[in-house]
């Protein structure tokens, strides 16, 4: 079976469409999604529509946690918008009650067994969805991440692609679909073959010019939202 590993979509439907087109061409059977479907950018409804066509497993990210808190706390929502832009507010406005409830009820972490492989899907680390596991993690942290006797651990949150191997465990961060931070343009994901146990970190080019302009119009006070999409 071929699995697409992806996450940190952040309401960027253009980037997600590019990844899903590539996944279709690669004959992917199933998506494993590390959370943060919403936040930062402005098309959460389209993101959910695109994902609805696929067999998928999804875990909660920190932006889904923000979404849940923002639904009942206007002051917290205002704080989120000041720091991260209007992505969470737009999700509350665009999505129906069922969609919002499902996003806010996503699990973390999620244990799966696929083709005889034990897989752990998480957002930050296996023990904390808001813990950052960067590519330069030290050996002690690497051992802790791989201590659960899994064949594959998939995580997100940092927006940096990473691939490590310790013993029989593959530890992978596919990078961010919607907002990569490693100064290479494009939408990041990974392709995993359960039969051969091979993994490929991939990046798909897409036209982000309309989204960049939208960021500049909506949030001139937050230049980061557009600048991060243009880093090289």
Question: Where do the model's predicted regions map?
Answer:
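Core catalytic region of metal-dependent phosphoesterases/phosphodiesterases
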Residues: 2-97, 104
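Active-site-proximal segments of metal-dependent phosphoesterases and phosphodiesterases across multiple
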Residues: 78-82, 115-148, 180
